[in-house]
Every structure is written in structure tokens, then in C-alpha cells.
């Protein structure tokens, strides 16, 4: 839930390990 992945996922995919897509950004916990 914390947007600290430094990655966006406008295409719906996160490449950073442990991160999930909370469009349009990747979040962790």
C-alpha cells in the first residue's frame, strides 16, 4: 500500500519484486 516502488504500471504490470499494481503506480504493502 505504500507507493515507494518508484515504478508506474499504466500497462498493468510491475517489474519490481514485491510490488503490485495500484493503477497507475506500483505499491508495496
Swiss-Prot record:
It comes from the Eukaryota. SUPFAM superfamilies: Cyclotides (SSF57038). There is a cross-link at residues 1-29 (Cyclopeptide (Gly-Asn)). Signal peptide: none annotated. InterPro entries: Cyclotide, Cyclotide_moebius_CS, Cyclotide_sf. Keywords: Disulfide bond, Knottin, Plant defense. This is a cyclic peptide. Disulfide bonds join 5-19, 9-21, 14-26. GO terms for biological process: defense response. Belongs to the cyclotide family. Moebius subfamily. The presence of a 'disulfide through disulfide knot' structurally defines this protein as a knottin. Probably participates in a plant defense mechanism. Has cytotoxic activity against a variety of drug-resistant and drug-sensitive human tumor cell lines. This is Varv peptide F.
Amino acid at each position: 500500500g505504500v507507493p515507494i516502488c518508484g515504478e508506474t504500471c499504466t500497462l498493468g504490470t510491475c517489474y519490481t519484486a514485491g510490488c503490485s499494481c495500484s493503477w497507475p503506480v506500483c505499491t508495496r504493502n
